[in-house]
Amino acid sequence: MLQPKRTKFRKVHKGRNRGIASGTEVSFGTYGLKAVGRCRLTARQIEAARRAMSRAVKRQGKIWIRVFPDKPITEKPLEVRMGKGKGNVEYWVALIQPGKVLYEMDGVSEEVARNAFALAAAKLPVKTTFVTKTVM
């Protein structure tokens, strides 16, 4: 699963998921899966969607993952009283804003790409839409 090799700090503040997304254009492939809402994508969700897509295209084409989980999320163990410091890092998330392209695909027909992205979207906690590369 995806996670950073090294980080400057082990734990981070919770923060808020506001603002507008960067990476809103399809830049590597021909087709893309774009987020419509905001959410926190876990590394497990990113990997599950990637597997669903790669199984759907049957080793044809190429898939790009445009998001990376770089924020650590901590949890305290079960039945532990409050206080005594912040919990341990349990998983990593990527903060997603509306308009962010999550995945891209190339080397397959549009019908196959739509089908693969539909399977991937079912694994994700955010509403998504299918986009194509716009050539100026």
UniProtKB/Swiss-Prot annotation:
A molecular function GO annotation: structural constituent of ribosome
Q: Name one GO cellular component term.
A: cytosolic large ribosomal subunit
- One Pfam family of this chain: Ribosomal_L16
Q: Has the keyword rRNA-binding been applied to this entry? A: yes
Give the similarity note.
Belongs to the universal ribosomal protein uL16 family.
What does this gene product do? Binds 23S rRNA and is also seen to make contacts with the A and possibly P site tRNAs.
InterPro entries listed in its UniProt record: Ribosomal_uL16, Ribosomal_uL16_bact-type, Ribosomal_uL16_CS, Ribosomal_uL16_dom, Ribosomal_uL16_sf
HAMAP family the record matches: Ribosomal_uL16 (MF_01342)
Q: Mind listing the UniProt keywords for this protein, alphabetically?
A: Ribonucleoprotein, Ribosomal protein, RNA-binding, rRNA-binding, tRNA-binding
Q: Which domain of life is it from?
A: Bacteria
Q: How does it assemble?
A: Part of the 50S ribosomal subunit.
Q: How is this protein named in the record?
A: Large ribosomal subunit protein uL16
**A single GO BP annotation from the record?**
translation
Q: Does the keyword Ribonucleoprotein apply?
A: yes
